[in-house]
């Protein structure tokens, strides 16, 4: 009896240990992800003119708000109520909105013709770092009509007015908040070309009188600033509209580099290398028109402010030109007009204070005003660095930001040495430490060993494919090596993380020398891209597949989702050891 019981216990322990080992070692190298239909269950309903589109979002997954696209075929869409999403931010695509829970989108139809459909595109990801290709659904519509006849040509294909559309001319968001323009305007007011003029402008606004009620003084100064703001706002709207018209051209590397050169010239003018201003004849004419206006009257003061916005001094021309070129990059007329209005308001706030309280609150003129002007030269230099970053890539962008930081903190340190005040010694230490920190990327570039630098900057030897036939051809040329197939897309955040962090690791690169590297870019989500994904039974990205020397996929080798360098290196070594 005891012997039989002992055998049963041993058998139970053996079975348990085998199960535990299976649970420990048979798990794949990547998390399990469901199909796109399981992640985002789609449904719809129609009640006459009202269509409701529904998505049931699986926990741990989310849909991108800006990726929704709804168009009608043989249907006129009256409106779409796209709800607000939850704020989301990642390193590569910045701020966006997502739907991590079930979402409904009401669509109102104006009219439909027989055979009308809605074409709906959407895209989502898993929170674990796995993204699905854009999904497209076509919804059949029942026929509805309005009281007035709709032209069939109009109803043939009507795009939905989805907020923040992805198609058509893209309206870029400004990378820096327009509120910075307010601070820049205030700073420009304290440059040597502007601040000394404020008492004179104040006297002109009041018509040479000081026996005016405080409320009237405040109103006159405010109206003057609004006139100036109107001029600048119109400038911003016109330039942003022009930028929207030529948005595609403004994104080309040649144009970006040319604009960067212009920004650098504008910055050099702030450092005193040369002066930028309107032709003297035009300035004289504008000044005469301004002087004809009657000071002390609201209409006259408003016109003086509007004309003052056109009279650019050497201190204001470069910053104004830089801001105008900057907002032209966005093509956003609202942001363009608002940015220039805030800039004018910033310049006008000190003027309102001087007009209301007199010169007592003004700081004394001195060399410090030239330092303010030079400081704005560094602000303008940040714009070409931002533009070149988009052309040269992250590595050179970081070096340029480092160079700008070293230059600014070095300038501030040299400036602080001129002051005899004791507390400036503390500030000198701060500037010096900041310059040392900012110089780190330059130090890494200058003093890194040549082998490491070349390894980091050299592109990986990927063989690019686009079709199933291309894949078969590459697998037939394996030459006894394991073939890694990397499926990449620009809309895949984790793909970019692989590219930036994992594939750049020196040990991973060294291990790659034992593999044949193949890559398919499926960003376009074309028919041949979908055929390749279907052939490989791929649900989404990132996905990396490994094939043996005979062209067969290695079991349990597929990587879905992001892996850091150490995890991925262990995976590669395990595959080679088998």
Curated annotation (Swiss-Prot):
EC number: 1.8.1.8
Presence of keyword Membrane: yes
GO cellular component, as recorded: plasma membrane
Signal sequence residues: 1-22
Membrane topology value: Multi-pass membrane protein
InterPro entries registered for this protein in UniProt: Cyt_c_assmbl_TM_dom, DsbD_gamma, DsbDN, DsbDN_sf, Thiol_diS_interchange_DbsD, Thioredoxin-like_fold, Thioredoxin-like_sf, Thioredoxin_CS
GO molecular function terms attached to this record: electron transfer activity; protein-disulfide reductase [NAD(P)H] activity
Membrane side Cytoplasmic: residue ranges: 202-216, 275-306, 358-367, 416-428
Reactions catalysed: [protein]-dithiol + NAD(+) = [protein]-disulfide + NADH + H(+); [protein]-dithiol + NADP(+) = [protein]-disulfide + NADPH + H(+)
Any single biological process term in GO: cytochrome complex assembly
Major subcellular location class: membrane
Organism domain of life: Bacteria
PROSITE patterns in UniProt: THIOREDOXIN_1, THIOREDOXIN_2
Start and end residues of each Thioredoxin domain: 436-577
Disulfide pairings: 125-131, 193-315, 492-495
Location(s), subcellular: Cell inner membrane
The entry's keywords: Cell inner membrane, Cell membrane, Cytochrome c-type biogenesis, Disulfide bond, Electron transport, Membrane, NAD, Oxidoreductase, Redox-active center, Signal, Transmembrane, Transmembrane helix, Transport
Transmembrane segment boundaries: 181-201, 217-237, 254-274, 307-327, 337-357, 368-388, 395-415, 429-449
Topological domain ranges for the Periplasmic compartment: 23-180, 238-253, 328-336, 389-394, 450-578
Entries under NCBIfam families matching the protein: PRK00293.1
Protein purpose: Required to facilitate the formation of correct disulfide bonds in some periplasmic proteins and for the assembly of the periplasmic c-type cytochromes. Acts by transferring electrons from cytoplasmic thioredoxin to the periplasm. This transfer involves a cascade of disulfide bond formation and reduction steps.
UniProt record similarity statement: Belongs to the thioredoxin family. DsbD subfamily.
Designated name of the protein: Thiol:disulfide interchange protein DsbD
Organism: Tatumella citrea
